[in-house]
Regions:
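Mobile active-site "lid"/loop adjacent to the S-adenosyl-L-methionine
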Residues: 122-152
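Conserved SAM/SAH cofactor-binding pocket of Class I
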Residues: 36-130, 155
Length: 243
C-alpha cells in the first residue's frame, strides 16, 4: 500500500479519524447526509452498508448507535483502508467489513437478517457522463455502475433486509423516478424523501430516500436541505451534522 498517497484527518468534529488516499474516492457530504438521515432506534441491532469504501458511513453511524454494522466493499485498497480506519478508532467490536462483491451475499448473510440496509452507490450509469470515467479504474467503479447497478442494488437490499425493515439511499435527484419504480419492483414502499440543494437558487442535486420493505402506502416529502449559503459556507443545518 502506497502510504505516500495517504492522509490521516479528523472526521469532522465527531472524535473520529479517517485514513484516505488521494487516488481513491474520498468521502463526501453525501456520506454524512445519509448517515444523519437514517432513523436509528433501540430496536436497531444490525445494519448493512453496501459499497462501504473506507468505512466512512459505518464510522459516522457508530456515533449514533451501538448496533452491529457491516460493510461490503469490492475494491481491495478501499477494504484495507476500511479495516485500518476501524482499528484506529477502536471499533473492531462493532464494525465488520467484508471484501467481496455484494452479489455474493449468501456466502456471508442470511436472507432477511438486517434491520437496516443503506448505500451511497455510484450515481452514474456506465453510459452517462463518460467524461467522468477515470483512467483510474477505482474511481470509475466508485462513480459509475460498473460492478453494481441500481436494479441489482435494490434487489439485493430487498433480500437482505427483514420484513418491515428499512432501506436508505442517497442518490441523484434526477434519477428519482427510476428509483421509485425500482423500489416498488422489489417490494419497497418509499416513506420519506428529502431533497438536498447545493444552494437555494439551484435545482435539487441530491435526494435522500427512506423505504420500508412491504410497508404501507404513504409518502412524506420532508423539508429541503440547503447545503451552502450564498457565500459558499455550509448552512447552520449542515454544520450541526458535523458535531
Amino acid at each position: 500500500m502506497n502510504k505516500n498517497l495517504e492522509s490521516l484527518i479528523p472526521l469532522l468534529n465527531k472524535n473520529l479519524k479517517i485514513i484516505q488516499r488521494s487516488d481513491y474516492f474520498n468521502f463526501s457530504i453525501d456520506s454524512l447526509l445519509i448517515s444523519e438521515f437514517v432513523n436509528l432506534t433501540k430496536n436497531t441491532k444490525k445494519i448493512l452498508d453496501i459499497g462501504t469504501g473506507n468505512a466512512v458511513i459505518p464510522l459516522f453511524l457508530s456515533k449514533r448507535t451501538s448496533a452491529k454494522i457491516y460493510g461490503v466493499e469490492i475494491q481491495e485498497i478501499s477494504y484495507q483502508l476500511a479495516l485500518r480506519n476501524i482499528n484506529i478508532n477502536n471499533l473492531n467490536e462493532q464494525i465488520y467489513i467484508i471484501y467481496d462483491n455484494v452479489k455474493n451475499y449468501l456466502k456471508y448473510f442470511t436472507v432477511g437478517s438486517f434491520d437496516i440496509v443503506l448505500s451511497n452507490p455510484p450515481f452514474f450509469k456506465v453510459t452517462e457522463n463518460k467524461e467522468l470515467l477515470n483512467d483510474l479504474e477505482q474511481l470509475s467503479i466508485a462513480r459509475h455502475e460498473v460492478e453494481l447497478n441500481l436494479d441489482e442494488l435494490i434487489d439485493i437490499s430487498s433480500k437482505l433486509v427483514k420484513d418491515r425493515g428499512y432501506f436508505y439511499l442517497v442518490h441523484r435527484a434526477d434519477r428519482l423516478s427510476e428509483i421509485l419504480v425500482t423500489l416498488q419492483k422489489y417490494n419497497f414502499e418509499a416513506k420519506k424523501i428529502k431533497f438536498c440543494y447545493t444552494t437555494k437558487q439551484k435545482n435539487a442535486k441530491i435526494v435522500l430516500i427512506e423505504a420500508i420493505k412491504n410497508g404501507k402506502v404513504g409518502l412524506s416529502i420532508l423539508p429541503p436541505l440547503v447545503i451552502n449559503k450564498d457565500n459558499g459556507e455550509y448552512t447552520d443545518e449542515v454544520l450541526k451534522m458535523f458535531e
